[in-house]
Amino acid sequence: MGVSYIPVARADELTPGGMKEVDLGGRQVLLAFVGGKYFAFSRQCPHEEADLKTAGQLLDGGKIRCNNHSYCYDLSSGECTLPKGAAPLTVLPAEERGEEICIRLEW
């Protein structure tokens, strides 16, 4: 299995509680900095495809709520925590490497 780290932002571009849209090969991904951790996830809510850039609200504990219908997702696992059992959010591993934030891709 191979691993690549794709730089998507500089570490100083995100403030605590902030989100930034990044393009990952034509796919729109959001990058967030919550609780000292970086998270990368799909821009679209899996419930009804709301744009989480505008409808999403970052919550303590590394979660995001889609304000259209109050669905909540864990940004580490993608699990829908409210309501339980709904379709998960697509998440990608993100980490700080030097002065850059990178998304880790495995194949």
Predicted regions and their residues:
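Zn-dependent metallo-beta-lactamase
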Residues: 1-23
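Rieske [2Fe-2S] iron-sulfur-binding domain
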Residues: 19-107
